């Protein structure tokens, strides 16, 4: 074992070397070999990788026992040279120190800049992988196959091109999928995956932990330990899991597939922003996985940002016992116009928009409210309720079973006239001084008070 005194610069061997600097301005050169570890300490250091291997560069001060502590105050220059799997490791940094780096943002000499919250910067080149510290780091990859690890803290991690490993670690992280085939692991706490960069429709399911083809130019990703999803500006299909999820569709006509848990669905709106739902938006939630659901889109609550949302009550009972008990969870629906029910006794109520409400199997109650609605009963003995004489020109299909349209809420001056047609043939319901409906597969009619 050699002791080096008053030495600032070291060149390694052809083996896998471990080279640590001191408080001086060091030049540490791995030279040759695979698996070298170079540690810059207190000075403005130059760390050079080997010519024929993959090396690890660590930021921090080396203690006498070989461990690292936070405190590398230098402005370092780090070049991985010829390796294709070099790693820059900031895991020694404590929570009060953060890093920010965009590996694809190069200066005129081909270097990327790591900006550190203490005011120092590192210039890096030929680095493929970065490990963050305990702070809230921002790590953006490049066109290569990157491994980006946030560590502790609420990190932002962005994959670009290449087949990447994007790992959040502890903290509430936001991970952006890239265009390659990425492995995305949120780690601990409440994490979000974003597909905002997609160029087309995406389909993502948090219940699928194996590789899934996302679409929209985003490759085939493996997603695990993720609670929340941000979609694209296109027509997305997003499914949660059994946890508490927040699913954000963004622009486009999005479909959310509901699962267990008290979830929040944002159609055409980003969380924390203000948005007014416009007629013509066609965001939907699919409750076909639920035991039973009650949704009233016309009943809303206003959040702190001024956005209105409706609630969906999900029951753990599939019997016709109402919704006063056996409520498993409650979802919050932002910007949702269309609902698909479960296979049992659902109640689906629309709003002033042109809604599509699908009862599916079971004896369902469907009420369109305003707008030109499409109401489909599916299997079972369904009831369709007209709210008023001017509640829109609705299209109603009872489906199979013994189905009823109910106009009893209309006033005495709003008589209806209908002759029921054969199965699968539409008949017109004429409403005096009101909006006419077209209906098919209806067996029973309840008239108005007129």
Q: Could you describe each region identified by the protein language model?
A:
Residues 1, 26, 52, 60-62, ...:
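GD-rich hexapeptide-repeat beta-solenoids
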Residues 1, 77, 138, 347, ...:
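Short, intrinsically disordered, charge-balanced linker/junction segments flanking boundaries
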Residues 4, 121-124, 220-223, 330-333, ...:
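Short loop/turn positions that demarcate and connect the beta-strands within blades
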Residues 12, 20-21, 30-32, 39-42, ...:
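Glycine-centered beta-turn/loop sites at beta-strand termini
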Residues 13-15, 120, 133-135, 232-235, ...:
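Extracellular acidic loop/turn motifs
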Residues 172, 381, 400, 438, ...:
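Thr-biased low-complexity repeat/linker tracts and other Thr-enriched repetitive architectures
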